[in-house]
Amino acid sequence: MSTKHWEQMMQLREVNFGSALPVEGYGPGFFRIGGEVWQSGVILSLTGVKEWRGFSDDHSLLALGEQIDVLFIGTGTEISQLPAELTNKLEGAGIGVEVMNSPSACRTFNVLLSEGRRIAAALLPVD
């Protein structure tokens, strides 16, 4: 009687983000991106990172229109609904929007960024 040994192998590959900046970390009131700590909401896109003042700062989001296919909006610790006016403006500009809590938005952004997708994220800090 012989015993078969099954060996599972996990393949690891280095993730290459090119010149884009992934979210390296986050915590209460901050994000770490590109080695810098941002103590505010942020907008990340293929062109860089900048401060985001929240839902009333719709001009910064609308400016992403031609550069992206999807915008991930992280609403902080908990998922919350976007103001209807903001949703209407983004949809009117042809921007696909996915709303989730900020930790989920960070992870999703990083995965799709590593795949070279045309995405951006607008993130509010967690509590």
Report residues per predicted region:
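C-terminal structural segments of small proteins and small subunits
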Residues: G96-L124
